[in-house]
Amino acid sequence: MKVTLISILTCAAVLVLHTTAAEELEAESQLMEVGMPDTELAAVDEERLFECSVSCEIEKEGNKDCKKKKCKGGWKCKFNMCVKV
């Protein structure tokens, strides 16, 4: 009886450890796959910088105080540029 119980508990422990390790590997592989290539990220950064600076320049030409456009997705407008928060 003791041997059976020890065997069952050992198998359960091995199964839990194996499952945890498999989940970690899967999460790591998804992190590596998900996301944009560096060239696409650079294009997004350039677009945000352009949108933010153009918005501010338009407001300056209209003789209004420069109220900086709110950048989205973890970015904010600072010194006429979008910067990552």
Swiss-Prot record:
GO terms for cellular component: extracellular region; host cell postsynaptic membrane. Disulfide bonds join 52-66, 56-77, 71-82. One of its GO terms (molecular function) is toxin activity. InterPro entries: Hwtx-2-like. The keyword Secreted applies. Keywords: Disulfide bond, Neurotoxin, Postsynaptic neurotoxin, Secreted, Signal, Toxin. It comes from the Eukaryota. Monomer. Neurotoxin active on both insects and mammals. Belongs to the neurotoxin 12 (Hwtx-2) family. 02 (Hwtx-2) subfamily. This is U4-theraphotoxin-Hhn1a.
